[in-house]
Amino acid sequence: PAIAAYPRVQFLLGHAGARDVGDALAAAQQYPNAWLEIACQGATQLAGLMGAIGPERLLFGSDWPFYPLAATLAKVLLVTEGKPDARAAILGGNAERMFAAAGATRSVS
């Protein structure tokens, strides 16, 4: 697959694979250059992703205007309750790290 052929390219898998979340998770487990954007995944699925690969390669995404922004944010806040580092990573820190790994030179801060 392309993700294996281009290890220096960062791949952001939208909606964490949507209905194919198992395939997206397998890719993230196998390839360190795979990141999962979590729009449209429920709180239970998000908790499962965090348990499987940790929060370090999960990125906040809302899929707005098709999915309510508040719902996506609420599930992140729920699943990361008491885990401030995970919350900060998912809500922005991971995006900065992913873009830095891709060669971006300007911070979003």
Regions found by a protein language model. Name each.
Residues 1-59:
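Catalytic pocket-lining loop regions of alpha/beta-barrel enzymes
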Residues 9, 34, 67-70, 102:
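Generic signature of intrinsically disordered, low-complexity segments enriched in small/polar residues
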Residues 15, 36, 63, 87, ...:
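Conserved, mostly hydrophobic/aromatic
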Residues 18-19, 65-67:
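Short, solvent-exposed loop/turn segments at secondary-structure junctions
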Residues 43-44, 66-68:
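Short gly/pro/ser/thr-enriched loop/turn and capping motifs at secondary-structure boundaries
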Residues 55, 70-109:
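Mid-to-C-terminal alpha-helical segments outside catalytic/metal-binding sites
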